[in-house]
């Protein structure tokens, strides 16, 4: 007998749960894309996106996913033959580096594994060793969705300044924007990329690139930039179609308007605090379960765990078995252990992730944790007692 019939909970790290307000905003007929309400709506999105990113500088959007935002950002500031430095803490660090390689850049990767954050001293040393300042940009993940590590972007800026290096600091906030605290201007970030389907609570299909004055200067020095990826007309449009390089992503814009209204009604500080409390509740439950069984948080140091996603190790085949049980027996879908082992490797089945980003509250998290505990019992997976009480205690204290 399955108990999954009812409203499901997609507890994966994106696409995240879409609020009813977003769905209602998108449920409409096609608008006029040349004049009228959509033009005014889009004009209003830009300052509100800046508020979420904590920047006074340029905000642009592209029809595409986070990978599109990666390429758009790179295409405006680096050319074939340019050097970039990639500190990697999981699958997506390597992914952005691979994209730079595909554009003809010379990529140097510093691999910190999948369980620890950046070692800022090693990055500073690498930049000091670049006496000729060949490195044009440092491509850094704020949060790597695969490993759930949270990196110190403000500390990275300080390390770059200490090295006296002029490289651009480019931050990937695809998993973290609207979930983990991020301060683009205060932290000295030159370029930030994000996407619609995680903390911004909109379906996949919008990529965002924010850039400051140093990045604008780098763009001005470029000999050639793809006409489509060029952020100059998007940031300073003379005509409405230039915002999106052609036909507007109409219904995504309606959804984004509703999502930004929700974000600003709650307040970004309150959103960060909500994500922090819910994440700590999940960690508390997992730590208790781990005291009596194989479950282990992928990131040992809580200071370097994302508040948007939690990666877990449990040993094969328990990860896959638990995911299947919670989905088909309880209606809770957990995330696969993306990038933790190669597909086909038996160890791949020993990892999973919990997404807790965007439109998520206390009862949703407690429900997911309850489903997981039921799965441990049903599958006879050893686990410590008292996990739900530990999570509830965190929520009660706030």
PLM feature segments, named:
Residues 118-177, 191, 199:
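Active-site phosphate-binding strand-loop segment of PLP-dependent enzymes
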Residues 185-197:
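Conserved active-site segment immediately N-terminal to the catalytic lysine
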Residues 78-94:
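Conserved PLP-anchoring active-site segment centered on the Schiff-base-forming lysine
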């Amino acid at each position: 007998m399955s108990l999954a019939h009812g409203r499901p909970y997609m507890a994966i790290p994106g696409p995240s749960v879409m609020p009813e307000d977003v769905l209602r905003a998108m449920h409409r007929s096609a608008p006029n894309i040349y004049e009228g309400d959509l033009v005014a709506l889009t004009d209003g999105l830009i300052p509100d996106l800046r508020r979420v990113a904590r920047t006074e500088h340029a905000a642009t959007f592209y029809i595409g996913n986070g990978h599109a935002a990666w390429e758009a950002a790179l295409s405006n500031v680096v050319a074939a033959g340019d050097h970039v430095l990639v500190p990697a803490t999981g699958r997506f660090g390597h992914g952005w580096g691979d994209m730079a390689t595909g554009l003809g850049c010379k990529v140097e990767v510093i691999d910190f594994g999948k369980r620890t954050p950046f070692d800022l001293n090693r990055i500073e040393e690498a930049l000091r060793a670049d006496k000729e300042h060949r490195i044009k940009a440092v491509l850094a993940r704020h949060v790597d969705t695969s490993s759930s590590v949270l990196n110190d972007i403000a500390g990275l800026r300080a390390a770059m300044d200490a090295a006296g290096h002029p490289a651009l600091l480019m931050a990937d906030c695809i998993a973290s924007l609207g979930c983990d605290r991020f301060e683009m201007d205060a932290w000295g970030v030159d370029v930030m990329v994000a996407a619609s389907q995680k903390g911004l609570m909109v379906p996949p299909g919008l990529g965002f690139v924010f850039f400051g004055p140093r990045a604008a200067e780098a763009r001005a020095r470029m000999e050639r930039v793809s006409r489509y990826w060029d952020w100059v007309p998007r940031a300073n449009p003379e005509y409405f179609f230039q915002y999106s390089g052609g036909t507007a992503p109409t219904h995504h814009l309606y959804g984004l308007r509703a999502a930004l209204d929700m974000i600003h009604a709650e307040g970004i500080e309150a959103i960060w605090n909500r994500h922090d409390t819910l994440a700590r509740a999940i960690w508390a439950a997992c730590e208790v379960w781990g005291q009596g069984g194989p479950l282990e948080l992928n990131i040992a140091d809580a200071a370097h765990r994302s508040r948007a996603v939690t990666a877990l190790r449990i040993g094969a085949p328990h990860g896959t078995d638990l995911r299947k049980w919670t989905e088909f027996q309880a209606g809770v879908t957990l995330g696969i252990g993306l990038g933790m082992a190669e597909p086909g490797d038996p160890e791949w089945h020993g990892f999973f992730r919990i997404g807790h980003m965007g439109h998520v509250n206390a009862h949703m998290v407690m429900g997911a944790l309850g489903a997981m505990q039921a799965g441990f019992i049903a599958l006879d997976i050893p686990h410590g007692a008292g996990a739900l009480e530990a999570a509830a205690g965190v929520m009660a204290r706030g």
